[in-house]
Amino acid sequence: MLRVGRTTEQQLLLGEWACLGVLYPTPTHGFAIAARLKPGGDVGRVWSLSRALTYRSLEQLAVRGFIQAVGEEPGIAGGNRTILAATRTGRAQLRKWLAAPVVHQRDLRSELLLKLIIADICNIDIDEMLELQRAGVAVMSEALTAQIEADPSDVVTLWRNESSNAALRFLDRLPRPHA
């Protein structure tokens, strides 16, 4: 099987975006990032990663030049912990990712929620993206409603329509501190 490497920022996995988002506001070590990405962590509530996958994501971010080692501190169980920080490029790519609406309805639950959590952690205003997101979901919802009217027995389209309507209600209920 041929494996093609990922080369662009849009090809980052959600776990990599989550790690970059945790590093954006302040440098820290991988163990602390992994703790935030546990299922009960502030970011892990939306997108959780095992410690091994967290470190793999950090390696991928370093290879792309989105994060770098900036120091060390003593570890609790011996050895030193490497302190990592988002690079200027990494910070710019994260802001660009946060500014882009989620394209596919199937990704709204995971990617949109992750963007909301990361934007809050990083104190980045995403109001414009949310307006674009709402407009895109509204267009999708209108098209699905028309399809349902044409064929009310299509359960897949009915499901997608109900999901898009729920997404619209969710987007409408979000607090807008910058509005």
Predicted regions, residues:
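Basic helix-turn-helix/winged-helix DNA-binding cores
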Residues: 2-106
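Short, flexible helix-adjacent loops and helix caps
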Residues: 42, 72, 99, 121, ...
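Juxtamembrane/interface motifs at transmembrane-helix termini
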Residues: 52-55, 113-115, 147-150
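Short, charged/polar low-complexity linear motifs in solvent-exposed/disordered segments
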Residues: 87, 110-113, 173-174
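Amphipathic alpha-helical dimerization/coiled-coil segments
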Residues: 95-135, 139-142
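Charged, low-complexity intrinsically disordered regulatory/assembly segments
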Residues: 124, 128-130, 137-179
